[in-house]
Amino acid sequence: MSTREYDDLSHAFAGAGGGLLSMTLTYPLVTLTTHAQTMVKLKKDQEKEKENSNEDGSLSPKSSNTSDVSQKKISQFEILKKILKDQGAKGLYNGLESALFGIAVTNFVYYYFYELTGKTLNRRSNPQTASNSKKVALKKGLSVWQSMAAGAVAGTISRVATNPIWVANTRMTILSKNQGKLGKLNTIEAIIYILKNEGWQKLFTGIVPALFLVLNPIIQYTIFEQLKSFIVKIKKRNITPVDALLLGAFGKLIATIITYPYITLRSRMHVKSMTEISEDVEKERTDSVQSLPEDGSDEDNLKENSAKSPYAETITKIISKLPSPIVSMFTLGYGMYKEEGVSSFYRGLSVKLLQSILNAAFLFYFKEELLILSDGIIKSTKRATGLANNPYNAKDVIHSFEKALSMRSPRTRTTTVASSAKE
């Protein structure tokens, strides 16, 4: 394993490039997973529309097959056939543009802040060597808790920063056929469309389960590090790239199984409008009120039920004080459990596991290949512009590119200044 020191921006650009390539290769699996997570709800909504459009009113909610639809398990093959029948092969790539934009930004932000946070923690834990040489402190590597802390910081920042992009991506993947206008927009236009029609809050729906998903890379890396240490101890050698690939895939497998319910919740919340969420919350409250005895004849039963659940009132009060995004997540989760069962949280898991493992493998490979290239370009640029001694200032690197362009001709310089003014 190489001990070469790489710049933070090198990791960021390599991660973004690796993410673009791996996402492009595995995106049809992403589409199948997203459809599997949300299709039951969409089919249920379609049945409700048919029920409401019934002129003679003979079809009651209880006698309809809505519940059957909500309980019906849809196979991945059926989903694939439906997509190909309705939209053709291009339907497997709905929302690809927004996904590529999202994964590039996510990986860039994640890897940049992961490396920056990790190196900061490393130097603070080794002040005596950090004061003498940066590389001496960094060769020791990060401890498990330092890696987890760096992953938590980087994951939180990247999730919050890119949540609007993934809301738009889910909409463009699932609803591009139903919402024709949305399907014709690019990512930025789709975000603006959602902002104008549903409000800025909608762009951050699913943020709570998204933040829970910060655990995914933390779990993956912890498993990876522990197994790596075990192999090094047993075989008395460093792990090979193939070892790292297999360990990373295994860590991703475990992390995805643990966090998949939150992935499903996030996808459901992305396609669910704010009014629908409010209606669900109101429905739960209405059902609770209607369950109370009307004439006092069931007062004894009510007391008996209250005695069985002495903490029910306390729990209700606690939930009422929670932030609305958390309440929305638990309301949606409870509704899924009640109507569709526990299996609804793991719908599409098999395809997601395949996609996640392949994506992690491709990402690992492409990132390592691009890392040397991006690091060479960035360090050469810094040496040419006199920034070699300040490797962590991204703003200065951007200015260095502008400076290099402005040195070509007065016309180029004018264009650069004008573009900067627009920004």
Curated annotation (Swiss-Prot):
- Solcar repeat residues: 6-120, 142-230, 239-373
Q: How does it sit in the membrane?
A: Multi-pass membrane protein
The alphabetical list of record keywords is:
Membrane, Peroxisome, Repeat, Transmembrane, Transmembrane helix, Transport
Q: Which GO terms describe its cellular component?
A: peroxisomal membrane
Identify the PROSITE patterns for this entry.
Answer: SOLCAR (PS50920)
| SUPFAM superfamilies assigned | Mitochondrial carrier
Q: Where can this protein be found?
A: Peroxisome membrane
Region annotated Disordered sits at: 43-70, 278-308
Listed Basic and acidic residues bias regions: 43-53
One molecular function GO term is: FAD transmembrane transporter activity
Biased composition range(s): Polar residues: 55-70
A Pfam family assignment:
Mito_carr
Role summary: May have transport activity.
Q: Domain notes, please?
A: Lacks a typical peroxisomal sorting signal.
Q: To which protein family does this belong?
A: Belongs to the mitochondrial carrier (TC 2.A.29) family.
**Record protein name field:** Peroxisomal membrane protein PMP47A
Question: Which organism is the protein's source?
Answer: Candida boidinii (Yeast)
Native organism taxonomy: Eukaryota, Fungi, Dikarya, Ascomycota, Saccharomycotina
